[in-house]
Amino acid sequence: MDGSVRSEDTWTVAGRTFRSRLIVGTGKYKDYAQNAAAAEAAGAEIVTVAVRRVNLSDPSQPMLVDHVKPDRFTFLPNTAGCFTGEDAIRTLRLAREAGGWDLVKLEVLSNTKHLLPDMEETLRALKLLIADGFQVMVYCSDDPVYAKKLEEAGAAAIMPAAAPIGSGRGIQNALNLALIIEQAKVPVLVDAGVGTASDATIAMELGCDAVLMNTAIAEAKDPIRMARAMRHAVIAGREAYLAGRMPKRMYAEPSSPLSGLI
């Protein structure tokens, strides 16, 4: 598929339309300059920002917005590091006051060892945030039942973890992801657990609308090159999904016709 055709393959969340299907984070880089270079190399249009960990408002210290420009990227504030619904809601209200952001990513973690989501707290916080005027993309477990509950509660997007945050273990439960994608009427994005380019490709081949990653790029030996690799991986996976893979067969089938042989 040529570039002109691919450019029309967009996705939409909360009324906002994007061409890039790769979302990148803003943590773990050696500095904001490297972070900005990686975001550019990834071809990203959205960057997710941990409100509690990134300087957005103190001009006396290095600021993310001096390097990753809000007029170039859509900022997606998140609640990384929050373990209660109240903490997450307070964090996102501060983000809205600081930058006017109402499209946000909710994550309410259950413990510090695996950083998997507390789904009861997540669902409760989601309902309160929606009532407060936020458009919420939700980090969640790969449980199709809870994913549907989040969608029915008004989530703008469902973001199941492929594996624990920062683990780099890749997609651990492709079946559950496929079930979530099949039933969803809102975008589904793999969030957390991607380790290398093939993981991103698999996520897109399953039918995900996009992939979010941070550590896989930031902790690579060459983050900028890995960002480029992830960009191509996401495109390849999406193209393969749209093309439709060949069926799997039990037995061989010759690739050349048998008729007309000497």
Swiss-Prot record:
**Pathway membership of this protein?**
Cofactor biosynthesis; thiamine diphosphate biosynthesis
Query: What EC designation does it have?
Result: 2.8.1.10
Q: What is this protein called?
A: Thiazole synthase
Superkingdom of this entry's organism?
Bacteria
Q: Where is the active site?
A: K105
Give the signal sequence positions.
none
Could you tell me what reaction this enzyme catalyses?
[ThiS sulfur-carrier protein]-C-terminal-Gly-aminoethanethioate + 2-iminoacetate + 1-deoxy-D-xylulose 5-phosphate = [ThiS sulfur-carrier protein]-C-terminal Gly-Gly + 2-[(2R,5Z)-2-carboxy-4-methylthiazol-5(2H)-ylidene]ethyl phosphate + 2 H2O + H(+)
Q: Which GO MF term does the entry hold, naming one?
A: thiazole synthase activity
The biological processes this protein is annotated with in GO are: thiamine diphosphate biosynthetic process
Binding-site list for 1-deoxy-D-xylulose 5-phosphate: G166, A192, G193, N214, T215
A single Gene Ontology CC term: cytoplasm
What HAMAP family does this protein map onto?
ThiG (MF_00443)
What does the protein in this record do? Answer: Catalyzes the rearrangement of 1-deoxy-D-xylulose 5-phosphate (DXP) to produce the thiazole phosphate moiety of thiamine. Sulfur is provided by the thiocarboxylate moiety of the carrier protein ThiS. In vitro, sulfur can be provided by H(2)S.
Q: What class of enzyme is it?
A: transferase
**Compartment(s) of residence:** Cytoplasm
Similarity-based family: Belongs to the ThiG family.
Q: Which UniProt keywords apply?
A: Cytoplasm, Schiff base, Thiamine biosynthesis, Transferase
Q: Name its species.
A: Phenylobacterium zucineum (strain HLK1)
Q: Could you describe the subunit structure of this protein?
A: Homotetramer. Forms heterodimers with either ThiH or ThiS.
